[in-house]
UniProtKB/Swiss-Prot annotation:
The lineage of its organism: Bacteria, Pseudomonadati, Pseudomonadota, Betaproteobacteria, Burkholderiales. Keywords: Isomerase, Pyridoxal phosphate. This is Alanine racemase. It comes from Polaromonas naphthalenivorans (strain CJ2). One of its GO terms (biological process) is D-alanine biosynthetic process. The gene is alr. Its cofactor is pyridoxal 5'-phosphate. PROSITE patterns: ALANINE_RACEMASE.
Length: 365
């Protein structure tokens, strides 16, 4: 019998979340962001649920090949562009759109011999300070690209660093508009947080939106808002079962380092899930879990293959009882948002999704 841990991908939730994006940005086309193997969900698994998107955005050519192998004939955007000159030929063959964010990429394109001109997104650095041309250098980059016979169409893009917080998007929008107001081409401005939080300010200004984490049911501005506040549904459940039981007396300790000390008599359950499965090792005592749909807590340190949970709130739990590490319990409708587990671990839901280990079996419902 296989180990009882399981990741379950909820396709109906993916479709629901995509529809939620369209409600928030009704006039925009949608790039469904499927980088990092669709945030750990698997490109092949999520494709049917997201195929009503107008395009897919991702990072590397292998992911693009996989989409084309699924018979996707629509737009695909390489969010970081091409890393080597030889990638440009494959972009042509696969019909990919790609980002231009530095002078070296323009140089590669200028030296490229092709019969199929490229569609590119020229990226402005409006304050994120990762990729893109500064506002002062953006127009010169656009002029040079526009003169290249290798370029068919130039669209414009930028990325908001603070759309999820109090700083907002005003400064970035002003910087972008000041430089691009008279330039032709479609715009893509909005990430997940901007789509949900700045609907009014961006209405009619972003021809394409780029939802990422919202498609996968996590709130981009947690804990200010939860996923349910935004009417998002969780798309991944990580579940397991109790494989061992212990009864503790006051003063007994649990796990490596004896970091948890029982204050009184209690029962604990040993769960088949550990950091080798992608569960964060730095989750502390108190991290929420569900046992048979009832909320309780993890106690002690996370081991490679096991965690231990407090069964005090679930006196009927025993061997084989279901444990929901995040997502939906199988019965009763109980939910444990991935964002709550991530906050306990000092990280974000994105990381937990992407970190689920290959040894964890995956089911699709």
């Amino acid at each position: 019998m296989p180990r009882p841990i399981l990741a379950t991908i909820h396709l109906a939730a993916l479709s629901h979340n995509l529809a939620r994006v369209r409600t928030a940005a009704p006039d925009a086309k949608v790039w469904a962001v499927v980088k990092a193997n669709a945030y750990g969900h698997g490109i092949e698994r999520v494709f049917d649920a997201l195929r009503s998107a107008d395009g897919f955005a991702l990072l590397d050519l292998d992911e693009a090949r996989r989409l084309r192998a699924l018979d996707w004939r629509g737009p695909i955007l390489l969010l970081e562009g091409c890393f080597e000159a030889r990638d440009l030929e494959l972009c042509s063959r696969l019909g990919l759109w790609h980002t231009i964010h530095c002078q070296e990429q323009i140089d590669m394109l200028a030296a490229h011999k092709t019969q199929l001109p490229h569609r590119v997104f020229l990226k402005m650095n409006t304050g994120m300070n990762r990729l893109g041309f500064t506002p002062e250098r953006f127009r010169a980059a656009w002029i040079r690209l526009n003169a290249l016979p290798q370029v068919d169409e130039i669209s414009l893009m930028q990325h908001f660093p603070d759309a999820d917080g109090p700083k907002g998007i005003t400064a970035q929008l002003q910087a972008f508009d000041a430089v691009t107001h008279d330039l032709p081409g479609e715009r893509t401005l909005s990430n997940s947080a901007a789509i949900l939080r700045h609907t009014g300010a961006l209405a009619g200004r972003s021809d394409w939106v780029r939802p990422g984490i919202v498609l996968y049911g996590s709130a981009p501005d947690f804990p200010e808002h939860s996923a349910s506040d935004w009417e998002l549904q969780p798309t991944m459940t990580l579940s397991s079962r109790i494989i061992g039981l212990q009864t503790l007396a006051a003063g007994d300790t649990v796990g490596y380092g004896s970091s948890f000390v029982a204050e009184g008599p209690m029962r604990i359950g040993v769960v088949a899930c550990g950091y080798a499965d992608g569960y964060p090792r730095h989750c502390p005592t108190g991290t929420p879990v569900l046992v048979n749909g009832v909320r309780t807590r993890m106690v002690g340190r996370v081991s490679m293959d096991m965690i231990t949970v407090d069964l005090t709130p679930v006196p009927r739990a025993g061997m084989g009882s279901e444990v929901t590490l995040w997502g939906r319990a199988s019965k009763g409708g109980a939910m444990l948002p991935i964002d709550e587990v991530a906050r306990a671990a000092g990280t974000v839901g994105y990381e937990l999704m992407c970190a689920v280990a290959p040894r964890v079996p995956v089911a699709v419902d």
